[in-house]
Amino acid sequence: MRKRVYFDNASTTKVDEKVVREMLPYFSEIFGNASSQHDIGIKAKDVLERSRRIIAKSIKANIGEIIFTSGGTEANNFALKGLFFSNYPQKNHIITTKIEHDSILNVCRWLETQGAKITYLDVDEEGFVDIEDIKKSITDKTFLVSIINGNNEIGTIQDIEAIGKLCREKNVLFHTDACQSFTKVPINVGKQNLDLVTLNAHKIYGPKGVGALYIRDGIQITPFAHGGGHEKKLRSGTENIPGI
């Protein structure tokens, strides 16, 4: 039998056996809707909030600042679209780089059809963005800088603390896609001046179809999905308890 060597963990990881064991009871035993008031629903709600607390603690956030999503792509869509529609038309300018994940670049291209102005910054031969280029690109119409933390193709780890400091000084929101870097490099939303952070599970030996968006308390953002009012009325839809 040929032995398989897997080198594509940057794309997705195998679900860890311990994770599978932890998930199983929530398919067949504690299968309730976390919004239900009966015993099984309350237990599902308890584990939902326990998971939210663990994620929040891992990035030094408050528990109420974590919104669960269906993955990193949805979280990126939520961050960019939600902020655009809550700031437009007073502000319509976003700064990003040319080497972002497709779920940033294609959202930016779509937002351009809705009235957004996007600056796509170049990077150097190692994939780093120049802080001065960000600074020079900020205008009175800029409301967001979105730059990936750890690049999904070449592995460059941006200096998000320096970028966050600049954005805070300029009163511009800063979003980073940390799907590739989460659990691999430290994320401290306060120290690094992060306003929104995208996370997901399937890059860290968890299941596909689940992610999260950190949204700093006080930020005004247009809801991503309307319905039953789940996730602080920002992302309606019954939560994926086994995945979360």
Where are these regions (language model features)?
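Pyridoxal 5′-phosphate
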Residues: 1-244
